[in-house]
C-alpha cells in the first residue's frame, strides 16, 4: 500500500513553483513537524489527507489523530463478532483517492489548501457541527460552497462509488439488518445513499442521540 502512495517519476518540487513549494514546505513543517524533504515523493493527495487530519486534530484539541469513523465501527463490530463486509477494498479506495487526478492537479489543490488554510479551518468546523447535528442540508450546502472537484472528478470520487455501493446494499438490506458507515459526502445530494435508498423503497430516518 505504501508503494501506491509514492510518485515514481515526479517530486513535489517538480510539480510546484519555487514560491509555492517553499510555502507548502514551511506549513507542513509547522503543522506536521516534517517538510517536503521527507514528503516530497509522496503523492500530493496523500500529503493533503495527512495535513487535513492534523489540522482537524489541532482545532479539536485531540492528543492523537482521530480514527476514521468506518474503521472505528468496524473494530466495534468485530469485537462483537458481527459479520463485516467492505463496500470496497482498501486498495480500491486508495486507487480512487490517489490516482483519479493528474499529479499536477493534486499539487495545485494542495497549494490551494495551504494558501486558504483559515477558510478551510472555518469550513471544517462548520462541517463538523453540521455532521454532529445530523444536518444533511447544511453539509451539502457547505460542500457546494467550497467544492474544488470538477464534474468528472465528482463522478469518479462520489457518484460512481455510490452507484456501486447502492447495488450491494439493495442486495444485502432486504435479508438482514445492516449498519452502514460511509463518509458524510456519500450521504447527500441526488446521488447520495440516503436519497437512493429512499428511491429503492427503504424508509430512512435519523437516529436520535442516545
Name each model-derived stretch:
Residues 151-210:
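A cross-kingdom marker for long, charged
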Residues 1-157:
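Structured, acidic catalytic/metal-binding patches in enzyme active sites
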Amino acid at each position: 500500500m505504501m508503494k501506491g502512495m509514492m510518485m515514481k517519476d515526479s517530486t513535489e518540487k517538480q510539480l510546484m513553483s519555487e514560491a509555492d513549494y517553499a510555502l507548502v514546505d514551511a506549513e507542513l513543517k509547522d503543522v506536521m513537524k516534517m517538510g517536503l524533504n521527507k514528503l516530497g515523493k509522496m503523492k500530493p493527495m496523500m500529503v493533503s489527507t495527512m495535513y487535513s487530519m492534523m489540522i482537524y486534530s489541532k482545532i479539536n484539541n485531540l492528543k492523537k489523530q482521530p480514527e476514521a469513523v468506518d474503521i472505528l465501527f468496524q473494530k466495534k463490530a468485530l469485537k462483537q463478532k458481527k459479520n463485516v463486509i467492505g463496500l470496497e477494498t482498501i486498495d480500491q479506495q486508495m486507487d480512487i483517492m490517489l490516482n483519479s487526478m493528474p499529479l499536477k492537479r493534486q499539487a495545485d489543490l494542495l497549494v490551494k489548501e495551504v494558501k486558504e488554510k483559515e477558510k478551510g479551518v472555518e469550513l471544517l468546523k462548520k462541517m463538523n457541527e453540521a455532521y454532529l447535528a445530523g444536518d444533511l442540508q447544511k453539509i451539502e450546502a457547505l460542500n457546494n460552497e467550497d467544492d474544488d472537484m470538477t464534474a468528472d472528478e465528482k463522478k469518479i470520487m462520489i457518484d460512481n462509488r455510490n452507484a456501486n455501493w447502492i447495488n450491494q446494499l439493495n442486495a444485502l438490506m432486504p435479508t438482514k439488518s445492516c449498519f452502514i458507515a460511509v463518509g458524510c459526502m456519500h450521504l447527500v445530494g441526488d446521488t447520495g445513499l440516503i436519497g437512493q435508498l429512499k428511491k429503492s423503497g427503504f424508509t430512512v430516518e435519523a437516529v436520535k442521540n442516545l
